[in-house]
Amino acid sequence: MAKNRFNQSWLHDHINDPYVKMAQREGYRARAAYKLKEIDEQDKLIRPGQVIVDLGAAPGSWSQYARNKLAQGRRRDAVREGGIDGTIIALDMLPMEPIADVHFIQGDFREETVLHQLEEVLAGRSVDLVISDMAPNLSGVAVADAARIEHVCDLALEFAQNHLKPDGALLVKCFHGSGYSQIVEKFKHQFKTVAPRKPKASRDKSSETFILGRHLKLPR
């Protein structure tokens, strides 16, 4: 009975969520697009000509937002792919419906076959921005969940270390709770500038937050 009440409460909040309605109206696949939008507007992350990698991209709302931003910043004299000034590569183990001008690679980005496909698209270029809305399946057991969250952040940090430009940036989703301070310390070890971000589009009840790291301390 309690579970049913929880599901009904979540459904009510979801249906009446202004960001859900806005996403439906503006064609985004998920309300998460507005989290990236708010952070981008604050920190000026996405700019014309960039190479952007979206980790754990499905269903694709972050890639959609990045694509729309690079389309708006298109220059007439720019060398571009399709309708954008820049390159967006979306990676996920899950399938994802195509997005115009976005390269999608399905698979585990730790595997050689996926990395080979990534390198083919990069064609020798380094990455300007890595964005990750990845989240593990949470069990409700604090210690276990903290380890899973830290592991996902570690994967993004390792990917960024291997592919970012020295002045590049990494934005990852995280959660306040046990282990959060350790994740922040790892960011500070890897990046010169580290800042937490809690966009208004994140639900008030959620412990979800984001960590932004800029400028690698030890470029590869």
Curated annotation (Swiss-Prot):
Domain of life: Bacteria
Keyword flag Transmembrane helix: no
One Pfam family linked to the record: FtsJ
Keywords: Cytoplasm, Methyltransferase, rRNA processing, S-adenosyl-L-methionine, Transferase
Binding positions (S-adenosyl-L-methionine): 60, 62, 92, 108, 133
Keyword Cytoplasm: yes
Protein family (similarity comment): Belongs to the class I-like SAM-binding methyltransferase superfamily. RNA methyltransferase RlmE family.
Record's protein name: Ribosomal RNA large subunit methyltransferase E
Organism: Burkholderia thailandensis (strain ATCC 700388 / DSM 13276 / CCUG 48851 / CIP 106301 / E264)
The gene coding this protein: rlmE
